[in-house]
Amino acid sequence: MSSGRIVQIIGAVIDVEFPRDSVPSIYNALEVKSAAGTTLEVQQQLGDGVVRTIAMGSTEGLKRGLEVTDSGAAISVPVGKATLGRIMDVLGNPIDEAGPIATEERWGIHRPAPSFAEQAGGNDLLETGIKVIDLVCPFAKGGKVGLFGGAGVGKTVNMMELIRNIAIEHSGYSVFAGVGERTREGNDFYHEMKDSNVLDKVALVYGQMNEPPGNRLRVALTGLTMAEKFRDEGNDVLLFVDNIYRYTLAGTEVSALLGRMPSAVGYQPTLAEEMGTLQERITSTKNGSITSIQAVYVPADDLTDPSPATTFAHLDATVVLSRDIASLGIYPAVDPLDSTSRQLDPNVIGQEHYDTARGVQYVLQRYKELKDIIAILGMDELSETDKQLVNRARKIQRFLSQPFFVAEVFTGASGKYVSLKDTIAGFKGILNGDYDHLPEQAFYMVGGIEEAIEKAKKL
């Protein structure tokens, strides 16, 4: 246990000088001897016994000359069943005022990804109960899913609905990592889980947006380490990360202070490597699976921004939320033409599901092309076939909307869980023209097709 002293503090980056024969290793955790007891993580060795570190907490009250001790190991967090139902910070300390976490077992947050031989793939579908997702971009059990969207199009609400549906229907464990998001949403989420009686199956790790960049940079790894423990015990785990963009952003914040040259759009030059280190660990092994759902903020609605573009490469399914669809009042605002999934293959999901999904996409794409003609010449100039197609497209567009359980307090409408079988049957019926006689508003904000038929009787 060697000790050194602080020689420089710039924002969240702190330089510490140690005796030359006992310089701490990269990623070692250092403890500052101060009232706050701040933890530092070694990032670089500058030579002459000086190491450059990131603070895992506020640097207020720190000053040059304070004593720092090397713990001799990386940051470690509690793992196992004792973490369920608890809220923890980046260092695994409880922040829910419910006493210490009753486990002796701790794992380091920096771990190697499973080797090629240990990994296992799977094609089992994970039903979400959300029509548009199950139809157009189905999720794979043990896969990675990204929810892409700009500010205020509903990423967190979609995420909370997915957690509610999957955590209640799926009986396994879940880990939720709140990375740089609003504290209010973290609080709402905790109460949502408590009210749904699934809190005892969820471990919550928060590093919210008011916290220093060190916390936001590492909190995703803290959550992932807890999920890996459950997976290695033979469980199927759900890992929710909200928001992966803030993980990148925290890296950007400290990158320049660490002396790195910025790359495109000011991002850190190590963007792809940092993302890869995190994403490669989120994988299924022969012991158990990790199914990961990640919200990805898209700066200025630009999907070609380096951060979302780097994330795309790692995902099995992408759910793209569109501002244009949200402006029509259709929620969830998922863009069925932009969202994709590796599972959308007749050999995996079956021919009927595949044909229905592709049929829906064809009709919506054709409607998109005809919109310009309709805007200039009006509906009357279209052929009979195109008129029929436009009517069906408008019904499909409305039928893709759905009331959410987690939004009941805002909408006043009770949430709906729609099984995959009912989803396929409903859209297949609209494509075949079985419901051409129903008005299009009957399809808006309903669950299954039977509900749309009932609603039409009241209109």
Curated annotation (Swiss-Prot):
UniProt keyword Protein biosynthesis present = no
Q: Which reaction does it catalyse?
A: ATP + H2O + 4 H(+)(in) = ADP + phosphate + 5 H(+)(out)
User: What are the subcellular locations of this protein?
Assistant: Cell inner membrane
The protein's GO terms of the molecular function aspect are: ATP binding; ATP hydrolysis activity; proton-transporting ATP synthase activity, rotational mechanism
Q: Name one GO cellular component term.
A: proton-transporting ATP synthase complex
Q: Which UniProt keywords apply?
A: ATP synthesis, ATP-binding, Cell inner membrane, Cell membrane, CF(1), Hydrogen ion transport, Ion transport, Membrane, Nucleotide-binding, Translocase, Transport
Residues bound to ATP = 149-156
Tell me how this protein sits in the membrane. Answer: Peripheral membrane protein
- Whether Cell inner membrane counts among this entry's keywords is yes
Q: Output the InterPro entries linked to this UniProt entry.
A: AAA+_ATPase, ATP-synt_VA_C, ATP_synth_F1_bsu, ATPase_a/bsu_AS, ATPase_alpha/beta_chains, ATPase_F1/V1/A1_a/bsu_N, ATPase_F1/V1/A1_a/bsu_N_sf, ATPase_F1/V1/A1_a/bsu_nucl-bd
One Pfam family name is ATP-synt_VA_C
Q: What class of enzyme is it?
A: translocase
Q: What is its EC number?
A: 7.1.2.2
Query: Known SUPFAM superfamilies for this protein?
Result: C-terminal domain of alpha and beta subunits of F1 ATP synthase, N-terminal domain of alpha and beta subunits of F1 ATP synthase, P-loop containing nucleoside triphosphate hydrolases
Q: How does it assemble?
A: F-type ATPases have 2 components, CF(1) - the catalytic core - and CF(0) - the membrane proton channel. CF(1) has five subunits: alpha(3), beta(3), gamma(1), delta(1), epsilon(1). CF(0) has three main subunits: a(1), b(2) and c(9-12). The alpha and beta chains form an alternating ring which encloses part of the gamma chain. CF(1) is attached to CF(0) by a central stalk formed by the gamma and epsilon chains, while a peripheral stalk is formed by the delta and b chains.
The similarity annotation says: Belongs to the ATPase alpha/beta chains family.
Summary of the function given for this chain in its UniProt record:
Produces ATP from ADP in the presence of a proton gradient across the membrane. The catalytic sites are hosted primarily by the beta subunits.
Name of the protein this chain belongs to:
ATP synthase subunit beta
What's the source species for this entry?
Answer: Pseudomonas syringae pv. tomato (strain ATCC BAA-871 / DC3000)
